[in-house]
Amino acid sequence: KKVDDKFGPLEWRLPEAHAIYWASVGLEKCDPKDDLMPLRRAIYQPMLLSFHRGRLVENPFSKTYEVRCNLDAIPNTDKAYREFAEQDPEYRDHILKAHKNFLKDAIYFLYSYNRISESAKYFKEFAELYPDQALLTGDPTSTPDKIALDEFVVERVEEDIGDNSPDRVRGIVEGLLESSFYSLALDQEEEATGYAAMAVKVWKKFDSATNDDKSVQERIGLPPFQSMREEALRQFLQLADENEPLLADALRVRLGLSADAYKRTEPAPEEGDRPESSEPAAETPQNQ
């Protein structure tokens, strides 16, 4: 419990928790005059892994467990980096470099999971600690005083994909929507809402860059968001019907669809099964 309170919450069915435990035992028992950096590293590196993949989510339809982000571990991970940097002046710069990269990920993933206020908190911390450091790889102008939180997150999505061509952007939007549908089917509402909101933001950014010129819009513009959402939903449900029918049924229930909506062997869904609004909407999972 002591280790979990200080470095967690940890998922003790995953190896990172045990690595952190034994390294913390080593810190307690070693002579303070010894080089403790290997032990400190053996704590903050697994803590970073625990943040990225330290939560188990049960998929009752496939009877498997999946690893997800452990966002609740972010506060203690942040604290550990800062304390270790203070305790070890020799390796301070090394630890703070790792801390800087951790903060970028924390901002991004908190926002992606619809924990906007927490994301803003760490964005502010980054701005205070690293005001002259770029948030985006390869863009030295993306310092926190020159890029807004929303803008950083959308740019980070595109950075992760590595391309912002129309086909690639469409793939990003559809991928985010499918992630939203999957999370919603597993009752992971926070994730579902976050993915849907991100899909809207990416679509809006690309659409606003092309809709001023009709010829450009016709040539490389994206379809309306609701059309993309409906197509992504159709593809997701039809694939799930083949591979995980119980998951597909769960999503239909969460979205208020009929039991045969979007089934491959059935005719097109009735009007009541279609999204009502033509405008992007992602505030609630029911709109995903």
Description of each model-found segment:
Residues 61-74, 127, 154-166:
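Alpha-helical adaptor scaffolds
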Residues 66, 157-287:
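Long C-terminal extensions of eukaryotic subunits of large macromolecular complexes
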Residues 129-152, 206-216:
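Boundary/linker segments of alpha-helical solenoid repeat arrays
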